[in-house]
Amino acid sequence: MTYIDPFPGTRGDALGNLAPYRNGHPHRGSDWHPAELSVIPAITSGKIAKIFWSDVLGNCVVQATDDGMYILYAHLAQKPKSLKKGSVVAAHSPIGRVGGGAKTPSGSASTGAHLHVAMCHQAAGVDVHLIPFSQLVDPFKWIDKKGATK
């Protein structure tokens, strides 16, 4: 099963990053920094498992992949209108648009327009944003290992 890099050349903070503004807490995912309102492509195929709002992460979508992972897409500009729980998505299918910037604030943890992605094995549970840090999978490494393509 192939995974894609959603925004090649725009990678930012990785899983575990200890930037000073995180107050000693490790980053719980990986960030990409495309232009605000860029269309976010599904990183791989699967089904939508959850769509929700978080005060910290803003508009979020969780995808259950066909190979047993959950992918959290966070800081979306708005709740996706064309997706609902159970929607089937293929790699490259639109998940939403990048938010978190001046035009589309999305969650208190947003440091400007970007896509935050967190991943875990489905056995850890659908609430990817709440599981223990030790159960998270590094999105950059996973995508690179799984043959990232544009």
What name fits each language-model region?
Residues M1-C60, A91, T104, K141, ...:
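Surface-exposed, glycine-biased beta-strand/turn segments
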Residues M1-P6, K84-A90, S110-K150:
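Acidic, glycine-rich catalytic/binding loops that coordinate metals and/or anionic ligands
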Residues H33, A64-D66, C120-Q122:
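A generic structural motif
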Residues A42-K85, G99-L115:
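Zn2+-dependent peptidoglycan hydrolase active-site motif and core
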Residues A91-G101:
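Conserved metal-binding segment of the jelly-roll/cupin
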